[in-house]
Swiss-Prot record:
It is a multi-pass membrane protein. InterPro entries: ATP_synth_F0_asu, ATP_synth_F0_asu_AS, ATP_synth_F0_asu_bact/mt, F0_ATP_A_sf. This is ATP synthase subunit a 2. Residues 1-33 form the signal peptide. The keyword Ion transport applies. The lineage of its organism: Bacteria, Pseudomonadati, Chlorobiota, Chlorobiia, Chlorobiales. Pfam families: ATP-synt_A. Key component of the proton channel; it plays a direct role in the translocation of protons across the membrane. Belongs to the ATPase A chain family.
Amino acid sequence: MKRVKVIQIKGFFRVMALLAPLLLNAYLPVQASEEHAAPVAAVVAAHAEAAVDPALEPAHAEPAGHEDEKAGDVIMHHILNSHSFSFEPFGTIHLPTLPPVFGIDISITKHVVMLWIVSAILLVLFSFVGAAYRKITPKTAPSGVANTMEALVEFIRLDVAKSNIGHGYEAHLPYLLTVFMFILLCNILGLIPYGATATGNINVTLTLAVFTFFITQAASLKAHGLKGYLTHLTAGTHWSLWIIMIPIEVIGLFTKPFALTVRLFANMTAGHIVILSLIFISFILKSYVVAAAVSVPFSIFIYLLEIFVAFLQAFIFTMLSALFIGLATAHEGGEAEAAHH
């Protein structure tokens, strides 16, 4: 590998290590939906009480669909944000609560904790790989984690950044690499038992999309200047059509981050709901046959599919971010080429 290439990649890791803490604030705290997310222990206790009480009158029996409602509460408890971590059957860790600021709950939630964990992993990973690259000479090749990260960097650099942005892609590569790794780790950690999927929180995905939006607009202003940026809003049409074109172009500016927000949030949330729903089928029907024939096999299949989706959604978000930047910075005659890639 050429020395210039080594120095360039080393620089990418150093910049990413500096940029990773910026994503610590990639959230807007949400209040826990306690009324929609009953603790698992309460559900188990309710079932136990009904089972050991032989004198339970039929008039006091639970409605037919009550068990379904309890199952739904447990599912939502695992999906929604909250101020506690449940480690059944070991107990629950309650996170610190802070007084509201201007009516906004800024208390620490489980999704905030997951964001901190992901950011810490990124800092350690990028620092480790950066240190490994500093020891590499032009006659040696990276190995282990550094080799894996080099392949990832080259993939994002060539197939995502360079192919979609073109000239000047180097300035945006650190952000694209960081956001890809950040989303990927958030998705993967959400599949681990006792973990939580921060990207299943629409506030997190919205903040990431806002980052892309402002970076895109800043890149467009830098590439075209203020006059060129405003001219782009008219789409090169006659002034008589500006009253129609300008609102359409302005709406188009905000539909892009909206699409990024909803796509990532919906895909990550839906996958977890499907997995938990399949698991609870056997409990609702109280059948080991259903569990063995349907719930377990399909849950494993969906779980493996979710691992693939975790990588896919991180790639799609990064690819679309690069595409939006490329379209915003493309000059006349280059926009079609950027769209083609």
